[in-house]
Amino acid sequence: MADESVNDYLRFLEEKTQGGANSGFEPLWLPDYLFDFQRHMVDWAIRKGRGEIMADCGLGKTPMGLVWASNVARKTGKPTLYLTPVAVCIQTVEEAEKFHVEARYSRDGSSFGHVVVTNYEKLHHFNPHDFG
């Protein structure tokens, strides 16, 4: 019985495997203001399709994430929902302006602009079908 449970679990895990295949697209915009390492990370995340940009404090996660989000919006023709902790929502929108990315803060589920910034606690207000 224990072997059967282990085999069932292994089959379950195999079904969840995504493999290393890319499911994204070729980047449409990689601005010159990104450092080489940032450009490489954003390029990888866009091509991968299902990836996460993880970087230490001060390495530019916000501009990298905003460029990623802008690429998704440009590719899909829909806004991208960009989630942040509540403490940095406004800062993210301000940085978007600095980095020439159209971003707006929304608390109520309205989707407007290229990138819609909100916090985790407000996610239930948003319809995923409105976003790329």
Located regions from the model:
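SF2 helicase catalytic motif II
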Residues: 129-132
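Conserved RecA-like helicase motor-core motifs
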Residues: 101-109
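Charged, low-complexity intrinsically disordered regions
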Residues: 1-11
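Conserved two-lobed SF2 helicase motor
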Residues: 110-126
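Walker A/P-loop
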Residues: 48-68
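Conserved pre-motif I regulatory segment
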Residues: 10-54
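Residue-level preference for the first positions of well-ordered beta-strands
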Residues: 50-54, 79-81, 113-115
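Conserved Walker A/P-loop ATP-binding site and its immediately adjacent core
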Residues: 62-72, 76-100
